[in-house]
Amino acid sequence: MKIAPPNRASHSYVQKLVGSPAEVFPLLCPVREAEWLDGWDPVAVWSRSGVAEPDCVFLTPASGGASQDAIWYVTRHEPGNGFVEMLKITPGATACRLTIQLTAAAPGCEAEITYTHTSLGPAGDRFVAGFTAEHYGEFMREWEARMNHFLATGTCLRGEVGG
């Protein structure tokens, strides 16, 4: 058995969103995300309700040099608390824990989003090395702009986000 210290990177970011936690929370879902995130298209979703719920599983296409689709598992889904936790396994690359905590903050809410990526091998080492605070900040600002556009207009912001 090999036991080794993890090669891991974790970053958090607080988004300022124009919707209330009750408006935002349902959009944190593999199905509903396609409404506001241009290009989001899961390969498959397993859900009794048809949307995010505890034990929902979904696949996203291989990306970033990965050879297999990523497997996502919703471990906690607490609408009343504005909290969701998901695990994402990209075989041969990374294991990721994603947490999102929504908190009411006028005029909408704040979303504290944390991604923690742990390498599972050489491909994961490369991913973790590139998962910098700068990269994460850019990713979060784009997500924030797209979510706010959807919350304000009800439409998906297509193409690149200016900044």
Task: Name the predicted role of every residue range.
Residues 22, 138-141, 145:
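A structural signal for well-ordered alpha-helical segments within the folded catalytic domains
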Residues 11, 56-58, 98, 109:
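Short beta-strand micro-motifs in enzyme catalytic cores
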Residues 18-22, 75-81, 101-110:
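A short, structured loop/turn motif at beta-sheet edges
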Residues 87-141, 158-160:
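Beta-strand/loop substructures that line and gate deep hydrophobic ligand-binding cavities in soluble
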Residues 1-51:
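Hydrophobic ligand-binding cavity/cleft-lining segments
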Residues 32-33, 44-91, 142, 146-162:
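Glycine-rich portal/gate segments that line the openings of hydrophobic small-molecule binding cavities
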